[in-house]
């Protein structure tokens, strides 16, 4: 009997698939049933080979060996995952397996994970695609009933492959180029570099910020306070205050308007990561990791989404969810539920996956017993669903203008008429008292009653107040995610899809890479560029730092998913960029190339090429990158006599090829002795010899 093989991304997901496919027989690395087999990857089972695996000459980083442009891309099994790969490869080639099912995450990265394993295993069997947005049993069962051919996802797969190859080409070539030209490891990344540039640019603005004073004049009659526009000159402000103090002012205009604020949208991944950081201080990575676990536990829908809407066919199920939210949220009662379901429905703005929602299973199981951090996330998602479908916030805005000494002074008041969705927002904020408060854009204030147009205000008091411009704030996880999401948007026309730096699924890992590489650092909730990060940005050309160019690449990948451009077009541009990087690096002046090298003590001249020899942690090495000469501090020759090479010895060896060494130890005679250490060269390699100086005759 023929079977089909399902490949999941993780073991926990595979178990959910197996349960719904009645594949209960547990084997080493897979589960099997009568009609199917379910196995799993462990994230990326396969990856692109390193340059030295294409050609051994790339083991040594040489600028003249660049560019590295593979004609045929080589794949290899990821470290420590060979056993599981062999399991999948064997299953793929089993004679009773008729076709495969790609059950990896329904998105670009899931396509890449499956495609690499499929190619590396040399499989040619037909593939179907499982595409689901929830791990609930009903969603899984429906997904298997409505599978499409993998051929229908070929453009998505192509975009995934091109993204990975572009990152490899720019990373490998850019990093090797700048490292060899500056004699210091400098890591270049397609998305990482412009993100670091944003951090460095913001920090530079902060460090060079000079505050400037500006002034206002406030008038009051004891009840109402009105304020002038900003005044740049202090003397002018003082003069206006003096003129108005004790004068009679006139109310020239009172304008009342009924206004409304609309509820927020549902969460996509980035907006959820931002709010989780604001409310709870969670990093983007921590939020994504917990969301993935909640997804696999069947409590939330697919997390790596870029949509904040749901589709028309979900209307009834979403309404049912909203009605059940008071069961999960103690601070929400049924009277606060609105009827704004239409606002969250937009078929045109849902591509692969809809907005993040709690599942029916979450309602049935409850969230009370979850760990605190996961419970926080679940509450955040649930209350957002209530807010997004809630009633509008209505308020009355009053603007009053008072004229005094021919100058206008103004005040604004806001009085709530209907709290609507803000009632839930306020209750949730009170629940999260330990979290960093979310800044209110406008505070609720009221204009005192009893004022009418034409009314005179006698003997008003006038006072000059001093204010200062504020420096830009350092990025935190919330604001950096926002900047990445909108990077380059102003440069695109209205018809262009705006994708920013990275994707919702990759932004967290980009931030983590910057921190782990030492180019950025966390200071409390702030994310700051390190000294090394700022130095790296200084040597990078504008086109590598450009958020606009990188955002345009993301847009092109999206167009590729839609079949509007080809992989050849995209990769042609990436290859051209690689060549441009090398052209620029080749022209870096010699003096500029030494910018990272500190003034170092010259130990001597290299006996092979004549260049300076410097001291390293483990050796004394030639400064010429093309020369391999080095004297090792711990070497076998001296080590056998319990001695290491020190700076004085190295200096004398380089100067006159001889140094006198005291305290050498002979194991054979179990005694210490003194001798001359001689340096010679054999095929350019250092060789040591001992010579015992003749004792002088008395």
For each feature predicted by the language model, list its residue ranges:
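Intrinsically disordered, low-complexity regulatory segments
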Residues: 1-164, 470-471
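Conserved short loop/turn motifs at secondary-structure junctions
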Residues: 2-3, 101-106, 183-185, 256-265, ...
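Basic, low-complexity terminal or inter-domain segments flanking catalytic cores
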Residues: 2-5, 81, 92, 120, ...
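Amphipathic alpha-helical transducer elements in NTP-driven molecular machines
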Residues: 11-18, 35-38, 42, 78-89, ...
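Short, polar/flexible loop-turn hinges at active-site or ligand-entry regions and domain interfaces
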Residues: 73-76, 104, 124-128, 149-156, ...
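C-terminal or mid-to-C-terminal helical accessory/interaction module adjacent to the motor/catalytic core
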Residues: 94, 137-221, 256-257
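Metal- or metallocofactor-binding catalytic centers and their adjacent structured scaffolds
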Residues: 234-267, 273
């Amino acid at each position: 009997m023929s079977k089909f093989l399902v490949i999941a991304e993780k073991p926990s997901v595979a178990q959910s698939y197996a349960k719904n496919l009645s594949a209960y027989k547990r084997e080493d690395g897979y589960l099997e049933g009568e009609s199917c087999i379910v196995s799993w990857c462990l994230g990326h089972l396969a990856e692109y080979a390193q340059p030295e695996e294409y050609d051994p000459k790339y083991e040594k980083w040489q600028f003249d060996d660049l560019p590295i442009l593979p004609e045929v891309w080589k794949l290899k099994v990821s470290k420590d995952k060979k056993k599981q790969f062999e399991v999948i490869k064997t299953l793929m080639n089993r004679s009773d397996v008729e076709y495969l099912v790609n059950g990896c995450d329904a998105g670009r990265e899931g396509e890449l994970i499956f495609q690499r394993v499929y190619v590396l295993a040399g499989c040619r069997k037909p593939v179907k695609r499982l595409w689901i947005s929830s791990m609930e049993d009903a969603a899984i069962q429906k997904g298997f009933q409505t599978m499409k051919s993998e051929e229908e996802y070929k453009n998505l797969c192509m975009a995934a492959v091109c993204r990975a190859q572009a990152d490899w080409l720019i990373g490998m070539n850019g990093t090797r180029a700048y490292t060899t030209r500056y004699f210091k490891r400098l890591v270049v990344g397609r998305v990482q570099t412009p993100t670091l540039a944003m951090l460095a640019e913001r920090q530079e603005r902060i460090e060079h910020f000079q505050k400037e004073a500006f002034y206002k004049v406030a008038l009051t009659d004891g009840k109402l306070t009105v304020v002038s526009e900003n005044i740049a000159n202090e003397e002018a402000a003082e003069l206006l205050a003096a003129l108005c103090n004790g004068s009679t002012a006139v109310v020239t205009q009172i304008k009342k308007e009924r206004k409304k604020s609309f509820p927020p949208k549902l969460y996509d991944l980035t907006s959820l990561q931002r709010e989780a950081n604001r409310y709870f201080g969670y990093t983007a990575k921590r939020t994504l990791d917990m969301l993935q676990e909640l997804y696999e536990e069947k409590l939330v829908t697919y997390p790596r989404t870029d949509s904040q809407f749901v589709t028309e066919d979900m209307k009834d199920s979403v309404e049912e969810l909203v009605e059940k939210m008071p069961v999960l949220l103690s601070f929400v009662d049924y009277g606060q539920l609105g009827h704004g379901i239409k606002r969250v429905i937009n078929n045109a703005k849902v591509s692969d996956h809809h907005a993040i929602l709690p599942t029916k299973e979450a309602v049935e199981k409850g969230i009370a017993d979850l760990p605190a951090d996961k419970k926080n996330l679940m509450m955040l998602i649930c209350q957002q669903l209530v807010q997004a479908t809630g009633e509008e916030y209505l308020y009355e805005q009053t603007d009053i203008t008072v004229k005094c000494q021919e100058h206008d002074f103004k005040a604004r008041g806001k009085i709530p008429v209907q709290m609507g969705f803000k009632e839930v927002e306020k209750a949730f904020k009170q629940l999260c008292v330990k979290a960093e408060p979310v800044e209110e854009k406008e505070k609720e204030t009221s204009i005192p009653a009893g004022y009418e147009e034409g009314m005179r205000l006698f003997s008003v008091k006038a006072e000059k107040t001093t204010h200062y411009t504020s420096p830009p704030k350092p990025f935190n996880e919330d604001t950096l995610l926002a900047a990445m999401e909108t990077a380059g948007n102003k440069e695109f026309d209205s018809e262009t899809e705006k994708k920013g730096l990275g994707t919702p699924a990759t932004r967290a890992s980009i931030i983590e890479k910057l921190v782990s590489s030492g180019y950025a650092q966390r200071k409390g909730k702030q994310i700051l560029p390190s000294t090394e990060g700022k130095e790296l940005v200084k040597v990078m050309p504008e086109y590598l730092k450009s958020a606009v160019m990188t955002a345009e690449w993301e847009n092109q990948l999206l167009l590729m998913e839609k079949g509007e451009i080809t992989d050849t077009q995209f990769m042609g541009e990436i290859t051209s960029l690689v060549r441009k990087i090398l052209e620029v690096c080749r022209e870096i002046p010699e003096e500029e190339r030494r910018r990272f090298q500190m003034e170092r003590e010259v130990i001597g001249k290299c006996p092979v090429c004549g260049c300076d020899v410097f001291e390293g942690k483990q050796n004394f090495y030639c400064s010429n990158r093309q020369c391999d000469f080095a004297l090792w501090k711990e070497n076998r020759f001296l080590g056998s006599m319990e001695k290491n090479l020190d700076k004085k010895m190295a200096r004398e060896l380089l100067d006159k090829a001889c140094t006198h060494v005291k305290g050498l130890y002979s194991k054979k005679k179990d005694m210490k002795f003194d001798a001359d250490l001689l340096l010679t060269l054999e095929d350019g390699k250092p060789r040591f010899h001992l010579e015992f100086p003749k004792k002088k005759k008395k």
